[in-house]
Design a protein with these regions (language model features):
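Short, flexible loop/turn motifs enriched in small residues
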Residues: 176-178, 250-254, 304
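Beta-strand->loop->alpha-helix junctions that form or flank phosphate-binding loops
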Residues: 52-55, 91-98, 136-139, 235-253, ...
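Phosphate-binding loop of NTP-binding sites
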Residues: 20-24, 58-62, 71-221, 227-238, ...
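A generic structural signal for residues located within well-ordered alpha-helices
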Residues: 117, 273-279, 326
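Short pre-catalytic strand/loop immediately N-terminal to key active-site residues, enriched for Gly-Thr
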Residues: 265-270, 318-322
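ATP-dependent carboxylate-amine ligase
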Residues: 1-37, 43-50, 63-67, 83-88, ...
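Short polybasic amphipathic segments
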Residues: 255-260
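Fold-independent oxyanion-binding glycine-rich loops
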Residues: 9, 31-32, 70-72, 93-94, ...
């Protein structure tokens, strides 16, 4: 039985990989200095939750087949140092996935935005038709126990390909490990400025990625992204290239319909970005053996990935949506989708700035007009988060100028922000909450109850 130890086992991706390997019959151990829900309960149920928090070099021994190193660990981590000393093979998360899938057809979904949704769409369609594949996805999907599934027998491996760094000691983007046979790139919008300081540096990662596609492979790309189209066409890699765009659709009584040769198809999701995602997912599914009619039947029941334009509640008049959007292109796409779908409603868009990039004075201008579809735009950020990072807090004026939106309110106190929401009248209104954080501790139950009381 193979034995692997996870350094930083509690992370979203890491604990899912640990569970997948445990289910595959490997012996798994791990460490972390903090483990939160749902990781904690899921690891405990499998019997692989660390008994005590912290880093313990004595857990590292020559009987291990390898170490899987998470991004949360630091370079000077005592367990990592012991593993280096003993000469144990140290894998980054993506490197290990590649090792496990060398004999499979690797299908990778990449791009600055839409990765999780497109991967979820493909997985939903394959599951609908009971087609078994291995997979790694970046969000919990309804009907799937884990975000990672690995077998010896499945032919395909579907991977959500992230451009962020592989590990603390491997500064390559994760997706450069995967060497796909088939890949989709949804778009390129500068992100992760803490590791890609210039836009050109960021774009260069995607150029390198396109060149890493296996010879004879297929690149599916969003032709409406001019930068992506250019670098796709420029690549000299011996691959097939297929472009996609937003398909024909219309909205009637709050429902989005896709125009198809088989007739008008009602969808559970909405927004041009999601329609574009559907067009891309269709290409990938067809390349994985699902025909167009089968795809359309299955996609009509897709409700969306967790935290992506997730409807928390509605009463027919008022709606509360939650979205993971935080990068400028994602915020703009989500905002525009809601504005188009709910033209008659009063719309309040709230965005929390809490990532390294979003709070950077040189980057915040990328958010210009991102909230322009709102009747009332709100930005929340916690100055304490900047102090922890030894950064100077942004002024209210800096934020207003950056967003270029007249009707913008800025909150820096969680209590004041919640008070604003709980004193607002939500009759025939849309409240869209966008963040990869939690607004300083949002009481979602109280907010939902209030919004739906009108």
């Amino acid at each position: 039985m193979k034995k692997f130890h996870f350094i930083a086992i509690g992370g979203s991706a890491m604990h899912n990989l640990a569970l997948a390997l445990h289910h595959k019959g490997f012996q798994i151990s791990g460490s972390d200095d903090a483990v939160f829900e749902p990781s904690k309960s899921r690891l405990a149920k499998a019997g692989i939750l660390p008994e005590v928090l912290g880093w313990y070099p004595e857990k590292i021994h020559e009987g291990l087949d390898g170490i899987i190193l998470g991004m949360h660990a630091k370079k000077d981590n005592p367990e990592l140092q012991k593993a280096i000393l003993l000469g144990i093979k140290i894998y980054s998360y993506p490197e290990f996935l590649y090792e496990q899938t060398q004999n499979k057809t690797r299908v990778v979904i990449a791009g600055s935005h839409g990765k999780t949704t497109i991967t979820s769409m493909v997985l939903h369609v394959l599951s609908y038709w009971e087609k078994e594949v291995d997979y790694m996805i970046g969000a919990q999907l309804e009907g799937f126990d884990t975000m990672v599934h690995l077998t010896d027998e499945n032919d395909f491996m579907l991977i959500e390909g992230d451009e962020y760094l592989s590990s603390p000691i491997d500064r390559r983007p994760k997706f450069l490990w995967y060497k796909p046979h088939v890949t989709l790139i949804s778009g390129i919008a500068w992100d992760h400025i803490n590791v890609f300081p210039t836009e050109e540096n960021y774009i260069e990662q995607f150029r390198t990625y396109i060149d890493s596609i296996m010879p004879g492979g297929v690149l599916v790309y969003n032709e409406l992204d001019s930068v992506l189209e250019q670098i796709s066409k420029e690549s000299q890699n011996t691959i097939r290239k297929e472009a996609y765009h937003v398909p024909e659709y219309f909205i009637e009584e709050g429902v989005t319909y896709l125009k198809t040769d088989e007739g008008d198809l009602p969808l559970e999701v909405f927004g041009e970005h999601n329609l574009s995602n559907i067009a891309g997912a269709k290409w990938i599914c067809q390349l994985m053996g699902v025909d167009e009619a089968e795809f359309l039947e299955a996609i009509s029941s897709f409700k969306g990935a967790s935290k992506r334009l997730e409807k928390i509640g509605d009463n027919g008049s008022s709606f509360l949506f939650k979205d993971f959007a935080h990068a400028p292109s994602k915020v703009k796409a989500t905002s525009d989708a809601v504005a188009q779908q709910f033209e008659e409603h009063h719309k309040v868009y709230c965005l929390e700035l809490h990532t390294y990039s979003s709070l950077n004075p040189t980057f915040i201008g990328q958010y210009k007009n991102a909230l322009s579809g709102a009747d009332q735009a709100v930005v929340f950020y916690d100055p304490e988060a900047l102090k922890i990072k030894n950064r100077i807090p942004l002024s209210e004026q800096q934020i207003k100028v950056a967003f270029g939106t007249e009707n913008l309110i800025v909150f820096t106190e969680p209590d004041e922000f919640q008070e604003f929401l709980l004193n607002h009248s939500w009759k025939k209104s849309i409240l869209l909450m966008m963040s990869s954080g939690n607004y300083g501790g949002m009481d979602w139950d109280a907010l939902k109850k209030h919004v739906l009381s009108f």
